[in-house]
Amino acid sequence: MRAAALLLALLAWPAQAAWEWSAPLTVNSVRSAAIFPHLESANHRGVAVSGDTVAVVWEDNRDGSPQCYLATKPAAAAAFQPEIRLSQGDCYEPVVAALGEGRFVAAWEEAGRAHARVLPGGKVLKLSDAEAAQVTLAAAGERMYAAWAEQAGRFRRIVVARLTLEGDALSVKTRRPVEAKKPADEQGWPALAVKGDGSVTVAWEDRRDHHTVPMVSYSRDGRRFARPARLTDQASGASPEGLGAGTGAMRPTLAAWGEQGIAAVWLDKRDFLSGYDVYAALDGGTRRFGENIRVQDSFGDNMVQWHATVVGDAGGRLLALWDDARDGTPDVWLSEWDGKAFGDDVAVPAASGPGAQSDPVATLDAAGSLHVVWLDRDEAAGTRIRYARAEWR
């Protein structure tokens, strides 16, 4: 009787909701052992969804030099359409953002300058006059911004531009360095997030304290920026065993989240024996980030994490993704914020298991579906860029 009652109780217990994944698709149409695709970009913005169309950007060397490509897939299509080439000269670190109704804006570094283009149909716009790299994009409503690392004397500094769009014509409305003074050391790898009110938050890697520190600033309209503040709560000079100027942290990423929130995720080496861990900080709408939160669970201890990114939506959903090799080979993992902490790490089914799966980029669409893109490496056959979509059920 006791066993029967227990069985009935288990049957009556509601099924736990989870992500339900589509079969993975291959994005790139050309691959070989001599072609090396890259998804790395500032703020890891390699995928976007506009209307019912998903777009993916990357760089590879199929033509003998690094070039940037974009491929799209309407929701009803069974496969990605053949990719188009965005660049003419050597190209690096492309990003893409959604404009709505199946339109996108892409940006990339080419010939030492930042460029952007509306797709389909737009012409290429040179964003920077000075040497620039590591461009990124963010858009919300009528506001669209780009940021990049621009040469200013000996070092690079972060510049943010507000972009405007008339038809297919893209133009720069304002262009401002986050700090007017020339940098004392290197700045790079900017990340952007735009709130519904049009204000913009920018984060970046900064070496003014002689070790790499994620810094953050914000502006109501892209014209004047607040004094930069640290994302990390580790003070300079707090390096373990007194080695160096402080612990290292790198590649900050940002996402708009909830009604007015901004989430930041980055790689942090404060536990220097295990390499980089994934850390986060949240701004609930006060323009001030809270305490640092370790993202990965205990099964990721003593294991280096890579390529961390964060995605969020207006409904309050917030996820971090990264790759690590805790099961012997690199796999893509995700963890979701539950309002108090990040939950258990979950492997993306098609991006885990035998082989090497890494470099995730992701986005949440207007319906709450999660779109993930990653590299699936095969030394003999070449690397595939893979895509899968998930719905919460």
What is each model feature region?
Residues A4-A12:
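Bacterial N-terminal signal peptides
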Residues A17-R393:
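Extracellular, repeat-based ectodomains that mediate carbohydrate processing or recognition
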